[in-house]
Structures are given as C-alpha cells and as structure tokens.
C-alpha cells in the first residue's frame, strides 16, 4: 500500500500585503500530480487545511476542490489542525464522506469515528486513528478518569494516543496496516530560526508540547502535522514524520525544501518514508546591504518575496517608495543606521492623533493602516477625550 502524507496547507495565508492563492493553487496541483503519478492508495492531510477557522469563500472552495479531486482515485483523510474549525470539519464531513473525503474535526472514541477502517476506505487494508489538534483544557470523554484532566498537556496527549494505539493494534491484527494521523507539537523537534514562525505562538510553547513518548509503538507509520519544517520526529519507536507546509509561509521558513511524504506500507512491517520535493512557490529572501548593492541585484531578486534591511548613514524618506518600485514582491523594508541609531521620533505638531497614528503604522508596517483600524483608533481617542 502506498500513502501520500501532506500537511499544513494554510489556504488563505497572506504574506504582508501579498495574496498567495495562485502559489497555493500551483502547489496543490503539484500534490495532485504526485498522487496520480505515484499511484497512491490513500492521501492523509495532517491538519491546518485552511489558515483561518472561517475561511473566505475562495479559500474554502480551493481546499474542498483539491480534496475532492484527490478522492477521485483514492480515499482521503484530513484532521483539523489548530488553524482549522472543528465545527466546520464536522459540518462538512457527512457531505464529503460519500465522495471519499473523511474529515475529522474533533477527538472521538475509537468506536465512534476516531478510527477509520477498510469499510470506510473502500476495502483498503488499513486502519487509521485520527487525532485532531487538542486545545488546552479540552475535555475528551473517553479518558479513564476526569481527574486526569488536571495533569499536564503532554500526559493528556499520551493518554489519548495510548487509547488509539490499543484500538489500532486490536483492529489491525495481522492483515491491516495501522496508522496514526495527529496534529501536535513534539518537544525536541526543529521549529526554526524565528521560533513559531508561521504558526500561532500560543500553540507552540511548552503548554502545548508533548514528548516523543506520546508516539505509541503500535502504528506502522505516524503522519504528523503542526510543524512547518519537514523532518523526522526524533526518539520515536516507529516511523513518524512532520510532512511540513507546502509553501514557505514566512521568512523563518526561507530556504526550506518543501515536500510531501510517500509511504510504502504493508501489514506486519514498519513503513518506509520517502521525501518527494515540492517545486512550486515563490522564493522568500532576506537581504541586508546598502541600497546600491541591493539595487544591483534587481534582476536576481525581482521575483522573490523580500525582507530588506538597508544600511544607511542617515534618514532616507524615499527608501520605502524606491524599494516598492524596484521590487514588486517586497514584504518588509527597514533602514539600519550606524550604531543602531533609532529612527527619527514622530512629533505631533498640528496633526490629529489619527494622522500621527497613521504615520506610525506606515513606518512600522510599510503600508497604510486599514480603514477599520483607523476607525477603531478614532473611537478610542474620542472615548478617552470624553472621560478626561
């Protein structure tokens, strides 16, 4: 049996002011081509299909169309990640399951939808335990004792995977391939140069970290999601892989080689995982240099998303404008002055507080403040004036 494991699509994710839907369409089409060319029997998506719990219509459509196209030739299983809405997954599940797409939004008992077997997979000799993202404090009704919820998050994750492990071993026997698909952080994995990077920092700290002991010994393969850097999970008793995101989602992921994982599995043997590169997606590049040196690389950098730090001897009021004119995919630009000198202070003068805030926002973000944010700021100022 051959499985394609992918994760962390984050459909709808933006990079600064730049929409990335065209890139996502390209890489998702690449995933479809790989699935067909490698004749895979099952596709697993280990969470964060969308970037927001309530995706915009074009994002929702792209995700659903991709899942349905993948399911035309084999079953598809997708669990909800921390960016996904469990309720959305559960609402869509009965509509999509007849088409071969199995969405699991919440953590369920093994005998109540938490484990998917051959009957739901068109006779495929596999049994798959599905572990969506678990939020801190979330009660799962098949825990042995309610008192266990006062234990640490890592213990809760391990208890749930232990229960799934038992169900997998019992149902797989000697004839089926047991698989676990999960969306959580294992401590000790490589997160990246900038910490949480494209992930929500709230869900990347110690409070949301499990240990490698949470990976049980029963599955022949564990398909992990949540970490965007593709990698093998260290210290586990069975093969476990973070497939990683399909695109470099922010500059902390610049230079990473994105992939899907092709898994060869058969009953009674540990699976073998193979990396298949994803070639689509625009480059993300960080550059620190003088403006003249950066401008000399215009041809090289013109098609890349850029984070520029420009070495300058003094104030250059036209830097942002020139940078945006030269580089259409510029995301950030900032001046670096000798000795780390701070930028000139903003002075109010005759300007309104809203005008001052608008300039501050423009300096910090290299783009105009959204109208709704300016309106909110104005309301706060008016409320402060009224109570002064």
Where are these regions (language model features)?
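Active-site neighborhood of phospho(di)ester-bond hydrolases with catalytic His/Asp-centered motifs
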Residues: 6-7, 43-48, 76-82, 102-107, ...
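Conserved catalytic scaffold of divalent metal-dependent phosphoesterases
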Residues: 91-94, 98-204, 266
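Active-site neighborhood of divalent metal-dependent phosphoester/pyrophosphate hydrolases
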Residues: 10-12, 40-58, 75-87, 186-207
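Accessory, non-catalytic peripheral segments of nucleic-acid enzymes
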Residues: 37, 42, 264-388
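Conserved beta-sheet core of the metallophosphoesterase superfamily
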Residues: 98-100, 186-269
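Binuclear metal-dependent phosphoesterase catalytic core
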Residues: 112-127, 131, 238-305
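N-terminal active-site segment of His-dependent metallophosphoesterases
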Residues: 1-72, 378-383, 387-388
């Amino acid at each position: 049996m051959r499985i394609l494991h992918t994760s962390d699509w984050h459909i709808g994710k933006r990079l600064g002011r730049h929409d990335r839907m065209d890139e996502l369409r390209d890489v998702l089409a690449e995933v479809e081509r790989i699935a067909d060319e490698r004749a895979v029997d099952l596709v697993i998506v280990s969470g964060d299909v969308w970037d927001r719990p309530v995706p915009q219509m074009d994002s929702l459509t792209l995700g659903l169309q991709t899942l349905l196209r993948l399911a035309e030739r084999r079953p598809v299983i997708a669990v909800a990640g921390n960016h996904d809405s469990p309720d959305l997954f559960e609402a869509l599940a009965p509509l999509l399951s007849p088409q071969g797409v199995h969405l699991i939004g919440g953590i369920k008992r093994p005998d109540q939808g938490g484990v998917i077997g051959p009957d739901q997979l068109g006779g495929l000799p596999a049994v798959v335990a599905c572990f969506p993202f678990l939020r801190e404090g979330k009660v799962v009704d098949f825990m042995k004792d309610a008192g266990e919820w006062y234990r640490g998050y890592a213990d809760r994750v391990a208890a749930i995977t232990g229960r799934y492990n038992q169900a997998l071993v019992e149902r797989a026997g000697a004839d089926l391939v047991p698989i676990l698909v999960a969306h959580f952080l294992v401590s000790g994995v490589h997160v990246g140069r900038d910490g949480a990077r494209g992930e929500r920092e709230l869900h990347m700290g110690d409070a949301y970290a499990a240990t490698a002991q949470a990976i049980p010994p029963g599955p022949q393969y564990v398909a992990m999601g949540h970490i965007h850097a593709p990698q093998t999970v260290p210290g586990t008793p069975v093969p476990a892989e973070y497939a990683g995101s399909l695109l470099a989602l922010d500059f902390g992921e610049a230079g990473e080689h994105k992939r899907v994982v092709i898994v060869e599995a058969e009953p009674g043997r540990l699976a073998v995982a193979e990396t298949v590169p994803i070639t689509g997606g625009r480059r993300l590049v960080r550059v620190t240099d003088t403006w003249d040196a950066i401008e000399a690389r215009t041809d090289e950098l013109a098609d890349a998303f850029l984070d520029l730090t420009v070495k300058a001897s003094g104030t250059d009021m036209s830097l942002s404008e020139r940078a945006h004119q030269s580089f259409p995919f510029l995301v950030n630009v900032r001046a670096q002055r000798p000795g780390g000198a701070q930028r000139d202070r903003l002075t109010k003068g005759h300007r309104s507080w809203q005008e001052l805030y608008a300039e501050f926002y423009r300096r910090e973000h290299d783009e105009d403040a959204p109208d709704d944010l300016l309106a909110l700021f104005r309301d706060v100022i008016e409320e402060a004036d009224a109570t002064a």
